Amino acid sequence: IAVDNYFVNRVDSPRDENGNYDYEALNCIDVKQFNEDMEALLAGKRVELPVYNFVKGEREYKGDFLQLGAEDILVIEGIHCLNDDLSYSLPRDKKFKIYISALTQLNIDDHNRVPTTDGRLVRRMVRDARTRGASAQDTIRMWDSVRRGEERNIFPYQEEADAMFNSAFLYELSVLKQYAEPILYSVPRDSAEYN
């Protein structure tokens, strides 16, 4: 289950110190509804799951139901999943937390590596363009907010993880190039995001 599908409607989203929507904040998630749905699923009930429409900025219900069997495992993904404030109603001893991060292993030369943040930005640009209706310029514009969100909402909780998984692949930038290059070329040269 993607926690992003529990985003509050965009108009109800919190704002940062600059007045911009703060999509990285925990209270951008409808935590109460998320917990109600997760408790119901773990109790074996049939639950209609939301789907967040990133283009409209609204949570929608489209008849996507889920019911867990006695032996099923519930997998939840999202930036706040290591934070127990997200899943306050779920017993800690029933959780196995995995911290997944893309830790790039590529070097430019013998002394300089490809920064992990660069690989994550390319991943995010491709994802946002394919699934969220966002341009590369939009993603780059939001990147500082995303990085602040990592510092506030991910890194402080990484020690809470029961396991760590590196999701980077040596060849992934080569694969992503065919998707990233066209959207990067669409960034206007005279825009702040071009530099």
Q: Which residues are covered by each model-predicted region?
A:
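Phosphate-binding active sites in nucleotide-utilizing proteins
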Residues: 1-5
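Conserved nucleotide-sensing/catalytic segment adjacent to the nucleotide-binding pocket
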Residues: 8, 12-58, 73
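Short acidic, glycine/serine/threonine-rich loops at helix termini
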Residues: 10-15, 63, 87, 110-112
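Short gly/ser/thr-rich secondary-structure transition/capping motifs
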Residues: 54-62, 145-148
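Short loop/turn elements that form and flank the Walker-type P-loop nucleotide-binding site
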Residues: 68-70, 92-93
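Structural recognition of the conserved hydrophobic beta-strand(s) that form the central parallel beta-sheet
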Residues: 73-77, 99
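Conserved NTP phosphate-binding and transfer environment spanning the P-loop NTPase/kinase superfamily
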Residues: 81, 85-195
